[in-house]
């Protein structure tokens, strides 16, 4: 019998050594495994595991009232029965006193690649049976795009990602890939729902081997794989829209755009062209104008225009570009530029959003209709855009704009979180910490003593993926994996299913929640339902017993390579887009009707609220990139992430010119700061990043010293601003951040405490 565990970053074999210790090994069928995942085995047994239920001392003394001490208080160990009793009392009290809309059930994160133990599914099922909850919509990864794309191409974000032109198709006919934001391979190591085999690097290499040229437009050279030998165009962060507008200007001025495609497949071009030519505000979007904004030489802009005019071109937009001030604009403008080139719907090019952002985008696999745990229906209609949680806690009842709607923030009295770490992914963490004190009660299911656990009132210790059985069924991955339990539950921890079952029993709906099914019953249920559903694809799965014995099953790869919007290209009348016009909307009357000042009827240059073109107090632009040695904040306690630290802090990439001007050397502990906070990090001097830009990867566990107001470990979200991309999308804007940096003095340097368990500090 083969033993595997599949995670969001890859699939591994597990075994026991002579001392009964779990060891992980790379799966031999994966040509590009993720190194940091091997550290899961050690992390599953480390000193930061939560050993039993805990309650915060101050909350217990004030029973059901916030005392403002979350994140600063001691914890008291309690029994499971006591923990279930306390939590169920608070849930009932909140429901009966304020209604279910006063409960915010959060599960944002990548807690499990398994379909059954998927934390959000468990949370939704439990709270829907309890009467509902206020929820969040969108993803921090691509919130602006989720709102924008239906208006522009008539497809939701997930359908768009699944429809991407495959690497194989591009390798056959494309000649140039213009990478706005690059294609960093480290990002492609992960995929929501799990990874069988890593394929992105193989796809990019095939394009390169077939002669496709790549241009990396980014402040970071490493945003492009080394083997591509890509042309490097360093650009000021947040100015990609201006560059694209200037390329459109050249195409229009030279009469080099594809008029037939614009006429037959788009609407609203004339209004957009008038803006580009300066007929609306007397400002031409010329190369000279764009150069002053982007810092790219005028000559280089003309050279880029010549490339895209003469070559079959793919316009690739990274997810990171829309996590910035007015983040809707670079994506909208990228689609518009691709439309002007006229190769949308062909293997020659078009546009892409998120190539190399995750493993599955661009692979040669069709989406599978896999089934999951039934979740029921949420009777509460209140929701927030996912990145507006601090606003919600600060301003209950306040009206806000979202996608043309006027909505109000719910008044939250209780937060229940399982699967995720808002003290990683949210912006302006000092502001979040204050807002986090407002609810009466905060309950979490958590594996380790991370910042999320330390800012809670009631803590249920949860299992890792190694401590449970599950099924990796990713709709966008051809490999299905039997996730087998590798070790017994650590100490007194439980699965999320067991935790919610215990609460459901206290609250009187255990039978409805479990349907009298065990863990393995549910796993087989999901397999059986998926086996039925896949018949629509003319495919057959083996029996569950055969699959479980072998440990994995691989589905066939389709013979026809997908090309995005190919049906629309072949016959726009027969296969219209789901936009009001049935076409690509370069100008949108729907968005125009919203009358928003920060998102107009067509792509537009908006000056960011912080950027290198308007320096006042802070002279460096901070990029908080995805980390190489962990997934977001997951496994920051793992060996690979720990070994990447500099003097125990997260490394910050600094250009040699900026370091020299500040008398900083490699390995120094430095202080990054702005009006929102202060962060310690370890200096890594490199000309891989352009002058004026520093890079501090996201995901270092938040480790604040509340007395000195300094974050000790290197979490960039202490410095980022918490404001929406626009009134349309309300996405996060973490990449619009100016900071200053200096060598830290002795009084500012403190030991990192986040990896010391509260259980061992007594």
Question: What do these predicted ranges mean?
Answer:
Residues 1-8, 440-441, 447-448, 482-508, ...:
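Phosphate/diphosphate-binding loops
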Residues 228-234, 466, 478-490, 639:
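Short beta-alpha connecting loops at secondary-structure transitions
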Residues 119-206, 210-217, 242-245, 339-454, ...:
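Extended redox/cofactor-interaction regions of prokaryotic respiratory oxidoreductases
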Residues 138, 247, 267-394:
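Active-site phosphate/pyrophosphate-binding segments
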Residues 1-256, 297, 505, 704-762:
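N-terminal export/assembly segments and adjacent metallocofactor-ligating motifs
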Residues 59-82, 249, 254-298, 302, ...:
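N-terminal leader/propeptide and maturation segments of large enzyme subunits in energy/redox metabolism
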Residues 496-550, 633, 638-653, 657-762:
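Long, contiguous, secondary-structure-rich segments that constitute the structural scaffold
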Residues 223, 450-483:
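Flexible glycine/proline-rich, aromatic-decorated loop/lid segments
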């Amino acid at each position: 019998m083969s033993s595997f565990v599949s995670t969001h970053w890859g699939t591994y074999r597990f075994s026991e050594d002579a001392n009964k210790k779990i060891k992980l090994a790379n799966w031999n069928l994966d040509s590009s495994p993720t190194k940091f995942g091997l550290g899961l085995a050690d992390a599953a047994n480390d000193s930061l595991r939560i050993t039993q239920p805990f309650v915060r001392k101050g909350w217990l003394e004030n029973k059901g009232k916030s005392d403002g001490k979350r994140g600063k208080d001691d914890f008291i160990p309690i029994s499971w029965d006591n923990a279930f009793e306390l939590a169920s009392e608070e849930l009932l009290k909140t429901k009966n006193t304020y209604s279910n809309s006063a409960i915010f059930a959060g599960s944002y994160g990548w807690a499990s690649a398994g379909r059954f133990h998927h934390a959000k599914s468990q949370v939704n099922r439990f709270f829907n049976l309890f009467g509902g909850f206020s929820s969040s919509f969108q993803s921090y990864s691509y919130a602006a795009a989720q709102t924008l794309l239906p208006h522009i191409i008539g497809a939701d974000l997930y359908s768009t990602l699944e429809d991407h032109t495959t690497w194989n198709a591009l390798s056959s006919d494309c000649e140039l890939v213009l990478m706005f934001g690059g294609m960093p391979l480290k990002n492609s190591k992960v995929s929501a729902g799990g990874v069988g085999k890593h394929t992105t690097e193989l796809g990019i290499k095939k394009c390169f081997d077939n002669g496709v040229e790549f241009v990396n437009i980014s402040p970071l050279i490493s945003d492009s794989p080394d083997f591509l030998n890509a042309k490097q165009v360093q650009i000021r962060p947040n100015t990609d829209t201006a560059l694209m507008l200037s390329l459109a200007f050249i195409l229009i001025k030279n009469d080099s755009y594809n008029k037939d495609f614009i006429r037959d497949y788009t609407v609203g071009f004339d209004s957009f062209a008038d803006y580009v030519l300066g007929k609306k505000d007397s400002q031409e979007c010329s190369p000279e104008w764009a150069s002053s904004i982007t810092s790219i030489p005028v000559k280089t802009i003309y050279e880029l225009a010549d490339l895209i005019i003469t070559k079959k071109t793919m316009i690739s937009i990274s997810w990171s570009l829309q996590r910035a001030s007015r983040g809707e604009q670079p994506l909208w403008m990228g689609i518009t530029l691709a439309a002007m080139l006229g190769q949308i719907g062909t293997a020659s090019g078009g546009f892409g959003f998120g190539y190399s952002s995750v493993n599955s985008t661009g692979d040669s696999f069709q989406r599978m209709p896999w089934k999951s745990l039934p979740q029921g229906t949420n009777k509460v209609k209140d929701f927030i855009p996912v990145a507006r949680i601090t606003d919600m806690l600060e301003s209950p009842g306040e009206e806000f704009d979202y996608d043309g709607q006027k909505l109000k923030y719910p008044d939250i009295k209780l937060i229940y979180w399982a699967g995720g770490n808002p003290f990683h992914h949210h912006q302006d963490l000092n502001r979040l910490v204050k807002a986090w004190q407002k609810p009466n009660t905060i309950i979490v299911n958590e594996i380790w003593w991370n910042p999320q656990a330390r800012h809670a009132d009631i803590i249920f210790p949860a299992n890792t993926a190694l401590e449970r059985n599950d099924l990796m069924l990713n709709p966008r991955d051809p490999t299905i994996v039997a996730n087998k339990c590798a070790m017994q539950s650590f100490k007194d921890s439980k699965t999320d299913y067991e935790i919610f079952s215990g609460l459901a029993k206290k609250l009187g709906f255990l039978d409805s929640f479990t349907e009298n099914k065990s863990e393995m019953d549910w796993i087989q249920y999901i397999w059986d339902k998926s086996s039925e559903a896949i018949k629509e694809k003319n495919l057959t799965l083996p029996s569950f017993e055969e699959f479980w014995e072998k440990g994995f099953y691989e589905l066939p790869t389709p013979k026809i390579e997908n090309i995005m919007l190919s049906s629309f290209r072949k016959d726009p009348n027969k296969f219209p887009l789901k936009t009001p016009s049935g076409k690509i909307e370069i100008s949108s009357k729907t968005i125009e009707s919203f009358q928003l000042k920060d998102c107009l009827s067509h792509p537009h240059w908006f000056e960011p609220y912080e950027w290198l073109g308007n320096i006042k107090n802070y002279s460096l632009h901070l990029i908080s990139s995805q980390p190489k040695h962990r997934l977001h904040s997951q496994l920051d306690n793992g060996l690979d992430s720990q070994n990447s630290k500099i003097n125990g802090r997260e490394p910050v990439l600094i250009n040699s010119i900026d370091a020299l001007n500040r008398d900083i050397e490699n390995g120094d502990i430095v202080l990054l700061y702005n009006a929102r906070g202060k962060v310690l990090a370890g200096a890594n001097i490199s000309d891989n990043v352009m002058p004026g830009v520093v890079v501090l990867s996201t995901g270092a566990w938040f480790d604040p010293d509340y007395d000195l107001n300094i974050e000790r470990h290197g979490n960039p979200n202490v410095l980022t601003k918490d404001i929406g991309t626009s009134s349309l999308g309300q996405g996060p804007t973490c990449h619009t951040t100016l900071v200053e940096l200096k060598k830290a003095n002795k009084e500012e340097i403190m030991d990192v405490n986040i990896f010391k368990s509260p259980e061992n500090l007594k």
